[in-house]
Amino acid sequence: MTIMRKSHPLMKIVNHAFIDLPTPPNISGWWNFGSLLGLCLILQILTGLFLAMHYTSDTLTAFSSVMHTCRDVNYGWLIRHMHANGASLFFICLYIHIGRGIYYGSYLYKETWNIGILLLFLTMATAFVGYVLPWGQMSFWGATVITNLLSAIPYIGQDLVEWIWGGFSVDKATLTRFFAFHFILPFIITALAMVHLLFLHETGSNNPLGIPSDSGKVPFHPYYTTKDFLGVILLLTLFMTLVMFFPDKLGDPDNYMPANPLNTPPHIKPEWYFLFAYAILRSIPNKLGGVCALVFSILVLALLPYLHTSKQRSLSFRPLSQTLFWTLVSDLVILTWIGGQPVESPYIIIGQVASILYFSIILVFMPIAGLIENKMLKW
């Protein structure tokens, strides 16, 4: 088996990626989330495939086909709730994975980091078009509001919106194409994830100290396969608890009502994992400005390698930057809360302050903190 593992063309790729891969000996549990994201992706593709077998992408039957899946298909309710809550789990792992990358300076692997940002955009697009498919009230109005944002683009905005809709409003053509996008995008994400891994294995993993660890690397198997397996067990326990006991906790009650274009919900909002970006969008009174802020709230991550001013890679020994990092995390929690609140005082001003703080920490305070810490090293 050992000979085949190292000589067979296909097995050799697997061997270099998951078995004999030289890995830093000191990487912590925060490095588990890459493999957990892979698990989430496989889970979403499998459950989505079974849901697609019973789904019809027609405005008249989409809602009832989802209800039919829950009521009449064997374990359809379980598959549907696993898929819906799997998206939340996916984004929890994704945000922790990005947070770990920021904390330990992994963004200095530029190619890996930029492909990661592209993966984030694609995952957000997949989740958005997927949210439209059940054709409930929030699905319909969420699709209408978010796609309408493109009309803020000068000159071509309105034409672009109508082109995406396939008509003059969100209708059958929109639903059909969103289903097509939702089906194909996860496979594109899978391919990109492999490229992400390819670039990571070119440089090797970073570690909590942020220093080279070539002299002391250990094989990935059995050390980190065992460690990842523990993460998988913990994640699946949390996930199945959520699915079995609180399946609708993270959803919107409005989505249990069929879409009605004549009745607008009192408060239109996306799923919880988009609320921070939605709060940033709403904090700017100008439509085009809001859309630019929304896109830049994610794109700003691409600037991190160029804003790195510290002589140290990781935040492990940088107390000032650590304080700013956890302030940023707290700020994102506040933005998530604000995104779910109605547009009224005091939520408007809180959202605006939190949005300014979000960009200030990343673009101004963290680079300055890095320079101050460099000075402190000389003292």
UniProtKB/Swiss-Prot annotation:
How is this protein annotated for GO cellular component? mitochondrial inner membrane; respiratory chain complex III
Q: Where this protein primarily resides, as one coarse class?
A: mitochondrion
Q: Which residues bind a ubiquinone?
A: H201
TM region positions: 33-53, 77-98, 113-133, 178-198, 226-246, 288-308, 320-340, 347-367
Q: Name one Pfam family in it.
A: Cytochrome_B
Q: Where, by residue number, does heme b b562 bind?
A: H83, H182
Record GO terms (molecular function): metal ion binding; ubiquinol-cytochrome-c reductase activity
Q: Does the keyword Isomerase apply?
A: no
Q: Does the keyword Nucleotidyltransferase apply?
A: no
Provide the binding site for heme b b566. H97, H196
User: Which cell locations does it reside in?
Assistant: Mitochondrion inner membrane
- Which cofactor does the UniProt annotation name? heme b
**Keywords linked to the UniProt accession:** Electron transport, Heme, Iron, Membrane, Metal-binding, Mitochondrion, Mitochondrion inner membrane, Respiratory chain, Transmembrane, Transmembrane helix, Transport, Ubiquinone
- Membrane topology, from the record: Multi-pass membrane protein
Q: Cite the cofactor comment.
A: Binds 2 heme b groups non-covalently.
Q: Which GO terms describe its biological process?
A: mitochondrial electron transport, ubiquinol to cytochrome c
| Subunit structure as annotated in this protein's UniProt entry | The cytochrome bc1 complex contains 11 subunits: 3 respiratory subunits (MT-CYB, CYC1 and UQCRFS1), 2 core proteins (UQCRC1 and UQCRC2) and 6 low-molecular weight proteins (UQCRH/QCR6, UQCRB/QCR7, UQCRQ/QCR8, UQCR10/QCR9, UQCR11/QCR10 and a cleavage product of UQCRFS1). This cytochrome bc1 complex then forms a dimer.
Q: What is the role of this chain?
A: Component of the ubiquinol-cytochrome c reductase complex (complex III or cytochrome b-c1 complex) that is part of the mitochondrial respiratory chain. The b-c1 complex mediates electron transfer from ubiquinol to cytochrome c. Contributes to the generation of a proton gradient across the mitochondrial membrane that is then used for ATP synthesis.
Miscellaneous notes: Heme 1 (or BL or b562) is low-potential and absorbs at about 562 nm, and heme 2 (or BH or b566) is high-potential and absorbs at about 566 nm.
Q: Which family does it belong to?
A: Belongs to the cytochrome b family.
Q: What is this protein called?
A: Cytochrome b
Q: Which organism is it from?
A: Cratogeomys planiceps
